[in-house]
């Protein structure tokens, strides 16, 4: 169904799960959470496990979305959390926490400026939430890779330029060559 689901068979769980868990457990569980590109619902499951009450997780792939929906219903008996929906769309969301991790839509852009504008659009369509958890392909990853072209590889300066006047924290979640690519997780907080 999804090649990344093999991570359940590895000896160690992905580092981003641990970091996302530790960050999210500090937030108010009544926060409105919008997750973009939830895949099979790994982060959605963390949110539900931690007791968040207002979670909307979007997945554009219908088959993967259905699998994530079943998973959340089976694990937490929660319906309506995962939706098969493209984002951004003509639907406006209001979120306190926006989550975009382990999800890259490189095909929608051709330049770094277009990619940064797309990320900004995600943020605006979520009504400029106070907290934005975003994992990106790090610019330190320099290998040729058509799935992760150079224009979507970001560094801290790119993120700071996009979110001026915000507090920005970051964690390396994957590092090439130990992993297949380098990724950094950012927590962007409005001040």
Q: Where do the protein language model's features map onto the residues?
A:
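A generic alpha-to-beta junction signature in SAM-dependent methyltransferases
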Residues: 27, 123-127
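Short catalytic micro-motifs in class I SAM-dependent methyltransferases
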Residues: 102-103
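A short, conserved alpha-helix within the catalytic core of class I
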Residues: 107-121
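A conserved beta-strand element that flanks and buttresses the S-adenosyl-L-methionine
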Residues: 99
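A structural alpha-helix within SAM-dependent methyltransferase catalytic domains
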Residues: 45-48, 119-123
């Amino acid at each position: 169904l999804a090649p990344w689901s093999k991570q359940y068979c590895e000896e160690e769980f992905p580092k981003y799960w641990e970091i996302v868990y530790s960050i999210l457990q500090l937030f108010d569980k009544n926060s409105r959470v919008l997750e973009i590109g939830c895949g099979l619902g790994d982060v959605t499951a963390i949110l539900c496990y931690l007791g968040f009450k207002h979670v909307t997780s979007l997945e554009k792939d219908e088959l993967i979305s259905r699998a994530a929906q079943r998973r959340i219903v089976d694990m937490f008996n929660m319906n309506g959390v995962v939706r098969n929906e493209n984002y951004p769309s003509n639907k406006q969301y209001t979120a306190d926490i926006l989550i975009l991790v382990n999800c890259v839509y490189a095909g929608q852009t051709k330049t770094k400026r277009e990619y940064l504008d797309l990320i900004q659009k995600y943020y605006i369509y979520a009504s400029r939430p106070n907290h934005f958890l975003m994992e990106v392909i790090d610019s330190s990853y320099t290998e040729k890779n058509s799935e992760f072209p150079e224009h979507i590889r970001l560094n801290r300066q790119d993120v700071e330029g996009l979110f001026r006047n915000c507090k920005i924290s970051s964690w390396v979640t994957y590092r090439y060559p130990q992993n297949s690519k380098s990724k950094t997780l950012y927590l962007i907080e409005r001040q």
